[in-house]
Amino acid sequence: MASKDFHIVAETGIHARPATLLVQTASKFASDITLDYKGKAVNLKSIMGVMSLGVGQGADVTISAEGADADDAIVAIAETMTKEGLA
């Protein structure tokens, strides 16, 4: 299992466009990937799950992956978070 903590700096938080990009990135991997926020965990491959969290600016989230490609998944998601200016 691999995980990484992120502090969301984007003014709009994880809104529709970056959420879609995160879901697309996560969906490339076979591992189970979750986004944890305020004690609630959702499947990062589910746009509805990600949007339901309402992650805003200043939030601390953890992304965890479990499976054969977990480490690669975390690296790719971290790159997406940085590229999109989320964290």
Swiss-Prot record:
- One GO BP: phosphoenolpyruvate-dependent sugar phosphotransferase system
Pfam families the record matches: PTS-HPr
**Active site (catalytic residues):** H15 (pros-phosphohistidine intermediate)
Where does the record place the HPr domain? 1-87
Task: Tell me the function of this protein.
Answer: General (non sugar-specific) component of the phosphoenolpyruvate-dependent sugar phosphotransferase system (sugar PTS). This major carbohydrate active-transport system catalyzes the phosphorylation of incoming sugar substrates concomitantly with their translocation across the cell membrane. The phosphoryl group from phosphoenolpyruvate (PEP) is transferred to the phosphoryl carrier protein HPr by enzyme I. Phospho-HPr then transfers it to the PTS EIIA domain.
> What organism does the record attribute this protein to?
Streptococcus salivarius
Q: Which UniProt keywords apply?
A: Cytoplasm, Phosphoprotein, Phosphotransferase system, Sugar transport, Transcription, Transcription regulation, Transport
Principal location class: cytoplasm
Keyword Cytoplasm in record: yes
Q: What is this protein called?
A: Phosphocarrier protein HPr
Q: Which residues carry this modification: Phosphoserine?
A: S46
